[in-house]
Amino acid sequence: MRGVVRKAGKLKNRLPVNEQWLAKFDLLRTLVRRDLEARYKGSVLGNLWPLLNQLSQLLIYTYLFSMLLKVKLSLKGLPENNFTYGLWLFAGLLPWIAFTGGLTQATNSVVGQTNLVKKVVFPLALLPLVPILSMFVESSFGLMVLIFFVAITSHTLHATLSLLPLVWITQLLLTAGLGYLAAGLTVFLRDIPQTLGVILNIWFYLTPLVYPAKVIPEQFRNWIFWLNPMTAIGEIYRDLILVGEVKHWGEWGVATTVSALIFCCGFLVYKRLRPAFADVL
């Protein structure tokens, strides 16, 4: 921890702006790496645990919706069976798992690091980003497994996979914006984490991740897409990984715009509240 604080202290030196940003990026990378190492330190399976957790959720939802509720779907180039439904389901769940995990942990990122908050030299803007990026890295293991099984099943790798970094930007903007907002408010309102848990449970079932969007009545479907960025993000993941073509350009554009606005608002609230963190904690 002393090494992290010393590295943060360098950011206060009279460095050119570009060097300050590089120093912050290097510090953020160090914090994310340490966070990932600390999560499963001492466990036998280590970093395989995130993948096992993701696969367990996949099996549960596949069994519930595909076998019990008999939800069926057909995708171009893939057989119409329960395994294809599992791939479709996993493609939608991956961004959701990264989103909710990162947001939930970011909520307590400030109140859980009082020693860093009270260090004058530490850039507090990095704290909510650490768990968000850690969850994003963890979800990448599941993403690689998904792409592997899609390639085996469809005998092809879609060129649209190259567009995944663009949808990651949308996803990170949304998660970071809400993470900044929740982290800042939690310092003053300790009920925020519990409230957020309830909101995320409702949000999950309002988002067509475990069921196709076509089952939503048409008069409500557009509202679900326009007002809920996670709907568009989940559909774009499926477009890029499973289908090989982007069918939701408009929804993607709206989701990116909304996510950027949420990021700006969340960061501004966090920045406004930041001077009082040390006094409250």
At which residue positions do the language-model features occur?
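Hydrophobic transmembrane alpha-helices and immediately adjacent juxtamembrane helices
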Residues: 1-281
